[in-house]
Regions:
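Thiol-/selenol-based redox modules, centered on thioredoxin-like
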Residues: 3-22, 142-178
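Loop/turn elements at helix/coil->beta-strand transitions in domains of secreted/extracellular proteins
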Residues: 55-60, 87-93, 115-117, 144, ...
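Short acidic-hydrophobic, aromatic-tinged amphipathic segments that line or gate anion-handling sites
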Residues: 117-127
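Oxidative protein folding and maturation machinery
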Residues: 1-40, 71, 84-87, 127
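Structural microenvironment flanking redox-active thiols in thiol-disulfide oxidoreductases
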Residues: 60, 64-114, 127-133
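A short beta-strand-turn-helix
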Residues: 21-60, 68, 77-81
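Short amphipathic alpha-helix with an adjacent loop that forms part of the alpha/beta core around
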Residues: 50-54, 131-138
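Structural micro-motif
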Residues: 115-119, 134-148
């Protein structure tokens, strides 16, 4: 009964669509959120507006964050590392918090170098997160962060949920394919 363990190398190839970018789902760009002005001590909630109003026509990124959670922190550092690329793209990135309490926990000073194209806000009533979770058939709405790249024709071309290595690079790969 002398069993010997032997390592076997297996080649792995991730198949990719031949198209540059594929539409993988839908998302309503008229969804409302509450934009927030000023990070830190003084918080001003602005009037609710749609993502379309905030971002203008074209593509945009939406992220639902879990402040203080490692997967969110990791994602924000990845995004900060690609600040100049994201700013050159010149499209809005809307980073949303589940509620005002979560927003107040966020410390932007922990993430120096985030792109200037970011709009912070609150996912009023959790509608945006719920819509993304349902339309993209994600496993659980609790696993944050969630990021999508979508356009104002309600097409989603990228989704990521939870802990993701190289999120910034993944976003840029899709952006360059648009």
């Amino acid at each position: 009964d002398d069993l010997k363990l032997e390592a076997t190398k297996v080649s792995y190839h991730l198949r990719e669509s031949g198209e540059k970018v594929a539409v993988i789902g839908g998302f309503n760009s008229e969804s409302l959120f509450t934009p927030v002005e000023e990070m830190g001590q003084k918080t001003t909630l602005l009037d609710r507006q749609s993502l379309l109003q905030a971002c203008g026509r074209g593509y945009f990124i939406v992220g639902i964050l879990g402040p203080g959670q490692e997967p969110t922190n990791h994602a924000l550092h990845d995004i900060a590392a690609l600040k100049s690329d994201l700013e050159k793209w010149n499209r809005k990135m809307v980073l949303l918090f589940p509620d005002e309490e979560q927003y107040k926990k966020f410390q932007p000073t922990e993430f120096p170098g985030l792109p200037s194209t970011i709009i912070y806000g609150i996912d009023t009533d959790g509608n945006i997160q719920k819509q993304i979770t349902e339309s993209m058939k994600l496993s659980s709405s609790a696993a944050l962060p969630v990021f999508i790249i979508a356009d104002t024709f309600n097409r989603v071309v990228f989704v990521s949920q939870g802990y993701t290595i190289g999120l910034g690079e993944q976003l840029m790969k899709v952006i360059h394919g648009l």
